[in-house]
């Protein structure tokens, strides 16, 4: 095994892969703690509001993980021998399944499938819907394989592979440009501008337009549309929130038109909103749920509407599958992480700390003309900046001051901290934002 000095790491990355855009630091895997990331080269500490793009539930080196010898032994077992979970049963995976069902799996979504990667979770949710819709059509006497289109929203991000390329359409066109895509129905995303009370009429108007577009597509493609998919809260597209009334209207349309409703909670799921799933706060249960990131291993949950056809993909062996069936190391890690989440009541912490973060962001919008539309559920918070260039400069200045925050949408800042973050750490990060704002007082908004 090659041992490199920290100073050599960026050179090796640059020599072997395209490292453009990576943070100018080398993460110290051992010294970093919680939401404090340590640069192995400089020794500088960074306050982490990035959370490895919303995938870190506990932050770095949580003591209940690092000091748990039994958990470490299980991790070592899984790391030394990479098992094909789809074919071999292990006590390690069984333990994870029990914990996942207890903590994360609603009785409303009894079927589960696991795979590595959020995009592949979405892909398999779509495959489940295609199979279901085609079987529905065959039962109606439609002899051809019809029912393989997906209704989706503008400013969606569902991944960068296969089917998902036809759905992803955020502000960065290079994520999908020149790759082949399907011509699937896309409707307006009637995102809320906050405070909602001041923008309700506009939001309701956009909802009406979106629903009319959806109805029009169902009128001309009813037998073709297998599902409606949306992120319960759009992440990459701009941290866009939707009213429960709109989600319920989509649910009603799906029921009326023999289509399944899929929620993509790869980014907004697993506790960041203050409940394990964001949909639990909104009163609308999906038929299929794609998950990942903080759950460590990704996958799909499914509800009873799948049972309207025989031999759907969750009961017929081999219809959806992969060699690794997820990743056993991720499952073993997730098993203990979910237990720690319960022990430390981190859903409650995400809700209360998120409320504090949102209060600080609302105060920021009142203090500076460069900020508006503060929004959030739990710790999944964001705020708009008056221009993209200003947003990008602001993020760069924050990094220089030791705070890592990331952007989304056209000109928004998003916050994705670990669920363990404290009030003091939130204040420290927002105080840095407040300090760098005056530097931009003469910039073009």
Give each language-model segment a name:
Residues 1-445:
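Conserved N-terminal phosphate-binding loop of PLP-dependent enzymes in the Aspartate aminotransferase
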């Amino acid at each position: 095994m090659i041992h490199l000095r920290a100073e050599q790491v960026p050179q090796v990355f640059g020599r072997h892969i395209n490292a453009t855009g990576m943070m100018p630091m080398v993460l110290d895997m051992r010294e970093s703690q919680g939401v404090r990331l340590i640069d192995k080269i400089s020794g500088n500490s960074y306050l982490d509001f990035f959370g490895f793009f919303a995938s870190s539930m506990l932050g770095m080196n949580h003591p209940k993980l690092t000091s748990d010898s039994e958990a470490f032994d299980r991790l070592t077992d899984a790391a030394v021998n990479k098992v094909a979970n789809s074919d071999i049963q292990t006590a390690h995976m069984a333990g994870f399944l029990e914990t996942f069902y207890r903590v994360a799996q609603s009785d409303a979504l009894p079927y589960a499938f696991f795979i590595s990667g959020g995009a592949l979770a979405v892909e398999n949710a779509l495959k489940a819907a295609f199979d279901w819709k085609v079987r529905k059509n065959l039962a109606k006497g439609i002899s051809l394989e019809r029912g393989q289109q997906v209704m989706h929203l503008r400013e969606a991000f569902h991944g960068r592979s296969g089917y998902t390329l036809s759905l992803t359409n955020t502000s960065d066109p290079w994520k999908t440009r020149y790759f082949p895509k399907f011509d699937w129905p896309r409707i307006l995303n009637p995102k809320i501008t906050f405070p909602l009370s001041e923008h309700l009429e506009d939001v309701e108007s956009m909802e009406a337009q979106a629903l009319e577009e959806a109805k029009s597509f169902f009128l001309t493609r009813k037998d073709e549309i297998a599902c409606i998919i949306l992120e319960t809260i759009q992440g990459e597209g701009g941290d866009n929130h939707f009213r429960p009334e709109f989600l319920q209207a989509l649910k009603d349309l799906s029921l009326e038109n023999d289509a399944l409703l899929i929620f993509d909670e790869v980014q907004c799921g697993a506790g960041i909103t203050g409940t394990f799933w964001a949909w639990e706060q909104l009163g609308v249960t999906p038929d299929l749920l794609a998950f990942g990131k903080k759950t460590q291993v990704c996958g799909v949950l499914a509800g009873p509407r799948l049972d309207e056809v025989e031999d759907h993909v969750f009961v017929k062996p081999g219809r959806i599958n992969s060699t690794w069936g997820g990743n056993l190391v991720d499952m073993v890690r997730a098993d203990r992480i979910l237990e720690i989440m319960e022990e430390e009541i981190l859903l409650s912490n995400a809700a209360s700390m998120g409320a504090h973060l949102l209060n600080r962001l609302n105060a920021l919008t009142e203090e500076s003309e460069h900020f508006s539309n503060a929004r959030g559920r739990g710790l999944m918070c964001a705020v708009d900046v008056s221009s993209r260039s200003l947003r990008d400069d602001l993020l760069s200045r924050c990094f220089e001051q030791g705070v890592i925050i990331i952007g989304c949408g056209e000109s928004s800042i998003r916050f994705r901290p670990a669920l363990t973050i404290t009030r003091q750490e939130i204040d420290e990060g927002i105080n840095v934002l407040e300090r760098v704002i005056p530097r931009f007082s003469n910039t073009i908004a």
